[in-house]
């Protein structure tokens, strides 16, 4: 699982002291070297640096080409620095997929032990807050109810976190999303990015997994990199793969058990 790659059309571009293309290139190299090969690669939004220009996605796809050459299925969500129409034009297989939610890019990735539900929280390009929306919440509820035989894992870009004042500045309709996933006990985890932070939490037994950014951090000591996810029947194991192998959380493994 990768998040917040923030790729510019210029592969030499630097932001916050980081060459984002170098970070993604290193992550891709590590993922393609995994043995056995992963069943899928998930990228959790903010694929592009700022406005989601066509050239951003051209460079992004060039950097991801080793994954595609290796035959690894690639699945994405969209974040606030993406442009949905430009993304669809760049990634032809995404453009050709069914669109069960009008104007949103959603997908279901099925595996032997769990089903993944990838949401679209892009509201307005290059504006920070995100929104799932009523139609997408209804679609998710229906899709979850139709697939209750396996654990369900939901991925969205924006952080579904309600602050002490009752507001959710990341995902504006966090409460509406939680109203869908919390009562459905076969939903075991909710993954998100956006904050460029690696963090684990729980709400009513639902695991909340904040993925680190591939690109750059906001806090000086925060890790950048990606997360290797191994699913089991009764839970999952997450391993942090830091860009800097000397980082204190590089190689950290967390075992998360499914709620009953």
Regions found by a protein language model. Give the residues of each.
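A short C-terminal boundary segment appended to hydrolase-like catalytic domains
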Residues: 230-260
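Histidine-centered catalytic micro-motifs
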Residues: 154-160, 188-198
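Extended active-site neighborhood of metal-dependent phosphoesterases/phosphodiesterases
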Residues: 53-147, 151, 173-186, 201-212, ...
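N-terminal active-site segment of His-dependent metallophosphoesterases
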Residues: 1-55, 149, 163
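Short, glycine/acidic-enriched loop or turn micro-motifs at the edges of active sites
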Residues: 7, 49, 123, 160, ...
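Short acidic, glycine-rich surface-loop motifs adjacent to enzyme active sites
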Residues: 145-164
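Active-site glycine-centered loops adjacent to acidic/histidine catalytic or metal-binding residues
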Residues: 4, 45-46, 79-80, 157, ...
